[in-house]
Structures are given as C-alpha cells and as structure tokens.
C-alpha cells in the first residue's frame, strides 16, 4: 500500500512507525465512559450508545491536552519540540476519527471517503478486526 502513488506522502517509513506507536491510544477516551456502560454485558440502549460514542472526542481531547502541556514544558525550558511528540499528534487524529465510516455514517462528525484521515481509516479496519476476533463482555463466547 505504501508504494501506491496516492499514498506516497502519507505512508513514509516514519509515518508508519508513528501510526504503530499511536494506535494503542485509539480508545483512550473510554476511560471517561462510565463502567455501567463500558462493561454492560448486553446491548446498549440508544442513550448509552450516544454516551459511548463520546469516547472519540474524550480521547482526542486528553491527547491534545498532553501535547499542549508537553509543548509548554519544552517552550518554558527553551527546548525544541521533539519529533517524538509527532506520534501524539497522530494519536489524536486516530482517536478522534477512527469511528468515521467511508459512507459518511460514522461519528463524531460524519466524515466520508477521503475526508477521513488515512491513519484513522487504517485504525478502523484494525478495530473492526479486533471486534470480530476478540471476546467482549457483550458478546457470547
């Protein structure tokens, strides 16, 4: 995929490495979801599902805060922003957009097709694979 012309600018070795490092943070916003919803062993109600969907923005917001605090520390100490912070910027994008759908029916913004950042599209595929191959509290074993 990285050798295809249309992905040349987005899939360099360094961007792939950052995505791999950032991917585990994609659901970090679930820490803000009440356990009664997150661990519910049955189908969520519409209201519960609306709350669950907020994990994308909660996660992106938490990562944004970490970026801002890190940059503030670097600026205060007159240090240049390290390249390692780039993975947090990628993590913010992945956390925010990994539930967008190609057809525009996803959340939080209803983005579609190329509007969805490539890193989030790739995370979405991995997230679906994980969902269908992993036991969850709400799935029968």
Q: Language model features by range: what are they?
A:
Residues 1-141:
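Histidine- and acidic-residue-rich, metal-dependent catalytic cores
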């Amino acid at each position: 995929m990285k050798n295809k012309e249309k992905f040349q600018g987005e899939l360099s070795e360094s961007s792939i490495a950052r995505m791999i490092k950032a991917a585990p943070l994609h659901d970090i916003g679930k820490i803000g979801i009440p356990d009664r919803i997150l661990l519910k062993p049955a189908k969520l109600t519409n209201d519960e599902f609306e709350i669950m969907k907020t994990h994308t923005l909660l996660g992106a917001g938490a990562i944004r805060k970490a970026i801002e605090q890190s940059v503030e520390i670097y600026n205060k100490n007159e240090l240049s922003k390290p390249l390692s912070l780039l993975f947090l910027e990628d993590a913010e994008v992945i956390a925010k957009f990994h539930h967008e759908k190609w057809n525009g029916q996803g959340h939080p913004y209803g983005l579609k097709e190329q509007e969805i950042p490539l890193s989030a599209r790739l995370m979405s595929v991995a997230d679906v694979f994980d969902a269908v191959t992993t036991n969850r509290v709400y799935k029968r074993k």
